[in-house]
Amino acid sequence: HTPQSALASKLGFTAAALANIASRDYLARHIDRVVIGDRRDALLWMKDKFDGFKTHFATLTTDNLLPALLASGTLPLIMQPVRHIPGTPDGTYWDGGIIDYHLAFPYSRLNNSTQGNLVLYPHFTDHIIPGWLDKALPWRRAGTGTHSHWIDNVILLSPSPAFVRTLPRAKLPDRKDFFYYGVNHDERIRNWKIAMADSERMRDAFAAFVAKPDLSQIIPLNF
């Protein structure tokens, strides 16, 4: 759908948000998913319908790279939408996080793939939220409900709560910091750099473990 005014966009997103409270399938009546990717990866595991959203597939080209990149970060109601991306369906494009916030896809389909049975999912938190509008709906998290099997073969790699508590303000940096620090840019930047340095040490420790695994660091899973 292509709203013709800011008011139409606001009304449309209000309707979509209310629909999402009831069901993601109801949200799918308002928004389609468009996947723009490398022609060398057919994404066959995503081609069979897996949720209520109509999914379109398009090839990434030199003509649509920039508008697709812009659309992927275009926040609804804050930024002007992107329209007419070459090689894609006509319509109005916004940040795909509205429906695919943390990419809660049917990774279990890859179990029969020649690429391997396990999916490594580096993440910034210990749970996967399907859509941005689902952030306040914990029952929508991946691993729960009728689609819980989607992540049976996923290894979720995320910072531990203990690590996060060591960071400035005991949290990961995010856009809310701009409001918290206000015009105190020096403190915000200093704390961000501290968090980045600590994260780099965590990265290096993980890389060292991958290169030379230390089984004494492994905690068995109890099923």
Annotate each PLM feature.
Residues H1-F223:
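Patatin-like phospholipase
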